[in-house]
Structure formats: C-alpha cells, structure tokens
Amino acid sequence: VLSMGACGTDSDKKASTQQGTQETASEVFDGPHSAQMKLDLSKLVTKLADYKGIDVTISGNYDVTDDQVEQNLMSLLSYYGITGVEVKDRDTVQKNDYVKVDYTGYLDGDAFDGGSATDTMIDVANNCDATQKTNYIDGFSDGLVGAKVGEEVSSDVTFPENYQSSDLAGKKTTFKFKIKGIYKPVTMDTLTDDMVADAFTEQKITTKKDLVAYVRQVLEKQAANSKSQASISAVEDDLLDKCKVTIPDEYLDARLQEYQHEFEADNCNDTQTLEQYAKNNNTTVDDMKKQWKELMIKQIKIEFIFGRIAEKENITISDDDFKSFVDYLVSSGNSQMADENAVYKYYGGGNKEDGKKTLRQLYVVNQAISYVVEKANITVEPDTQTTESSEN
C-alpha cells in the first residue's frame, strides 16, 4: 500500500552500467536520515478521528460477468494463435472468412523487403491480420474473395503517399497470395478441448471448461484487487480529511532529500542530470519538487495517522511476516533489490539499519490500514460510465 517511492513511478530496470552508478550513489548519501529521527505520534497526530466502522463509498463495477469472461477469453485465444476453425465443406473464399495464406509483395517485378509472410491468417472482411488485428493497405485482400484453396491469386495495391517507407510511398505494387485454407472465426461454440489443450500446454489447461474457469479466476482476482485499492484510498482520504497532523519541518526535509536521492539513482546517470531529466519530460526541477512535496506531505500524514492507530491497537509485526515481506521485495524484479541487504540499503539510503527500521514501520502502517478497511462500512456505487461503455 505504501512505499518510500510513493511520490513517483517505478523506473524500468537499468542497464548494468547504470546499476553501478546507482549503487555508488546509495552508498554516498550523507543527508539526515528520517529513520533516525524520534517521532512521538501521540503528539504529532493532534486529532485522531474515529476509525472503527467508518462509512465510505467507492464507485466501480467489481462483479465479473459472463460477457467479460467471453471477451477476455477470445482475446486470450487470439494471443495464443487460436483465431479460426478450418472450413472443410467448401473450398471457395467468402467475404466473411478468415484465410490462411503465404504472400509476397512485388515492386516493378521484384520482391521487396518486408513484403512477404507465411501462414498468415487474414480477416478478409476487415482487411486485417486476424490474429494481431493490424490493418493492411486498402485493397490488400480484395483479390481473395472467390479464390479456391490451393490457388494463387494477385492483388494490385497502391501504397499511400504518406507511407512510412519512402521506397514504397505512392508506389503501385502487386501482392501474390497462395491460398492454404479457409477458416471461420472461433467462437465459444466452435472452440474444442483439443484446441485448448494444444495451445495451453504450459498452463496445464486441457479443456474449454477449465479455460473458462481460469479466465474467470484471473478477472475476479483483478476485480478484487481493484476493489481493495479503491477501499484503501477511500479510507485514507476519509481519515486525512477528519484527522489533524503536524509534520516537523526537519522530518519533511529529510524525507524529500531521501526521495530526491532515490529518484536520481533511478532516473539519472553520468549522461543525464536531474535538470536534463526534467527537460526531457517537459517540466522543471522546481515543478517536480513542488509535486514531490505535495505528495510527500500526504504520504507522511497517512503514515502518521495509521502509525498512531497501530500504536493504539497494539498492531505489531512478527519476524516471520517481515521476512516474507522482504522476500517479496527481493522477488519483485527491481535490480536494486537483488537480496535482503540490498533491500535495506535501498530503503535506507545506503544504511541497512535505517532501511530495516523504515520497512518495519511501513509494514506496520499497512497492517493498520488493513485493520481499518476491514472494519469499515463500504458502500459500492456502480460506475455507470463503465457499464454504458461496455454495453455499447
């Protein structure tokens, strides 16, 4: 729920040369460490509102429908290459067919680079790739209707004047197709257990029924996570509005310095300063710092409020639970948190003990948030916009 990086987005994994720069930066951070500052939350949280059984409202659609399952299942089938069922009672292509072809494009009689493919499934009616749903040049599939399996047919195509390749822009070309099979779009009725078993071997899904159950389980998990996050945000906002918190200036300054250090380690290197990063993202360092401060104040208030609740409710953390939490961070794929010590250094600005203390505090805060959410009276209002858009 909370993290030291709450003021910004996670960066992509860096190249190995950048990792070295980042690790060095973490080691040399010598600013005041917020983890070393003594905080008396009973004095800093000057007003702690009632937090048991609070009433909050969230909006959204968290029930998974059969239509959603079918739509997502069809997208999954397309991703795994299951796009059509072969038609065997006729051999002539019709407008609404999918057609498997090999094709080659010719410019002035010579095959051109990037103009050929094998075993491509074409959606004739929509003039697009049946699997990727990417559109072809106008007229590309016009010559396929009426062709027979085993035949070779041609289509004359003129590329647009603004086509990305200057060699082809505005040029007249010819595409030759070999018709290899006729297919109908796969549907829930035509999907078979054998098709599922062949495509989902690694997942050990062998039947259509199992695939439907798998997709529903994934969607229900996503919906539950979305509902949980919405509930957490609503509870946090409610208590932020009702509680009063004082943040010591030196503590806020330390947190902002720590965050900037972490941000620069993630996003800056020998070839990109913070100023250059800001310029590349159409902003300024001053504007970035203003945003960081605004978000950090909210972050700290949440930590103080729920930290105080944890004190009042005697919420603590066991060593086993904390180890599981750290192991989860290690497995997250962040190159800067490859092992337990690296995690502590990452959250402690190079200081393992500070990082360990900070993480334990954050974990307890998260437990307190869960405690309040579990006791809250949460009303769900359907998101009418989402419902209407899904029906259209």
Where are these regions (language model features)?
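FKBP-type peptidyl-prolyl cis-trans isomerases
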Residues: 7-392
